Amino acid sequence: MKVTLLIPARYGSSRFPGKPLAPINGKPMIQHVYERASLAKGLDSIYVATDDDRIKDAVESFGGKVVMTSPDAASGTDRINDAIALLGLNDDDLVINLQGDQPLIDPISIEQIISLFERHPGEFEMATLGFEIVDKRELDDPMHVKMVFDNDHNALYFSRSRIPFGRDTNDYPVYKHLGVYAYTKRFVNAFAKLPLGRLEDLEKLEQLRALEYGHKIKIAISAFDSPEVDTPEDIRKCELRLAVD
């Protein structure tokens, strides 16, 4: 089983145009993501998946590899599906989907999600990461997706609302979703063909499509947060974190 990590990156963003190329401590954000991912053990290859020549040129300038995907990709999953077809991966190969706006991703978290598939072959089709919320401001922030899972760490639901809701107490752990996915090439192909889910459409969360159609998502709880860069204001926060990392 080969393990390929893909970093989907698009230039257009309503809140932050050109986000992948935003400089953080003298490097474009996409370079931070790529270089931190490359520290993870167990990866056979890493590619940035993009349809933009500016991103392609930036990645190749620091020695990274790029796969050029269709500009018509409607979602991140469609871009991943396009990339794995172009790369000619085998059905059983493992694909890691790491968002291009996570410059603080810890390589150990990537290794953790790979090990799930190695330790539990054939038990599930998709895996992702969670992190226990420590900043209480994130609890009711819809930009931080919350998650609940069963006793075997299979996902039950993802929501932009706080879940679970403590009727009589606020003293309980709440977990947020970290945007890293792992799945086989075969599953990505099948997932991309599924119609839009009702809950997926309401919450605007692609992973809900898998749950709505009866697929298991295994959860690994990471010891490391991986905050996403959503606005220009987030850049300064990343610079401060990277300075002491």
Curated annotation (Swiss-Prot):
First-level EC class: transferase
CDD domains listed in its UniProt record: CMP-KDO-Synthetase
Reactions that this protein is recorded to catalyse: 8-amino-3,8-dideoxy-alpha-D-manno-octulosonate + CTP = CMP-8-amino-3,8-dideoxy-alpha-D-manno-oct-2-ulosonate + diphosphate
Domain of life: Bacteria
MF terms (GO), sorted A to Z: 3-deoxy-manno-octulosonate cytidylyltransferase activity
InterPro entries registered for this protein in UniProt: Cytidylyl_trans, KdsB, Nucleotide-diphossugar_trans
GO biological process assignments: lipopolysaccharide biosynthetic process
EC number(s) stated in the UniProt entry for this protein: 2.7.7.90
Pathway: Bacterial outer membrane biogenesis; lipopolysaccharide biosynthesis
Primary localization class, coarse: cytoplasm
Compartmental location: Cytoplasm
GO cellular component, one term: cytosol
Function: Activates KDO8N (a required 8-carbon sugar) for incorporation into bacterial lipopolysaccharide in the Shewanella genus.
Name this polypeptide is given: 8-amino-3,8-dideoxy-manno-octulosonate cytidylyltransferase
